[in-house]
Regions:
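Phosphate/ribose-recognition catalytic cores of enzymes acting on nucleotide-derived substrates
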Residues: 1-99
Length: 99
């Protein structure tokens, strides 16, 4: 695998033959400050199944923003919510532009 530039991305995640839209973060989680090597975290949109332990593939579709350190956890949570909305709007635009 290859690690993209750090940041927040709109992604497509494939698992069990299905494709789901998501918002992903690639980075070291600077607000929490607990990592040295970057990791990938994906929040799937409108998804409530348990896929922990499953093999998945992630396709990076669009970069939303660079990784950022927030002043506190509350600010981080607000920005994650904003990122998810930005990703949802990006996917909606792709669908509308295709029609």
């Amino acid at each position: 695998y290859s690690v993209p530039v750090r940041g927040v991305f709109a992604v497509l995640l494939r698992v069990r033959g299905n494709v789901y839209r998501g918002a992903a973060n690639v980075g070291i989680r600077p607000t929490v400050g607990d990592l040295v090597k970057p990791i990938l975290e994906v929040h799937l949109l409108n998804f409530n199944k348990n896929i922990y332990g499953e093999k998945v593939s992630v396709e990076f579709m669009h970069k939303v923003r660079d990784e950022k350190k927030f002043s506190n956890i509350e600010s981080l949570v607000r920005n994650i919510e904003k990122d998810v909305k930005t990703v949802e709007k990006w996917f909606e635009k792709q669908i509308n532009d295709a029609n």
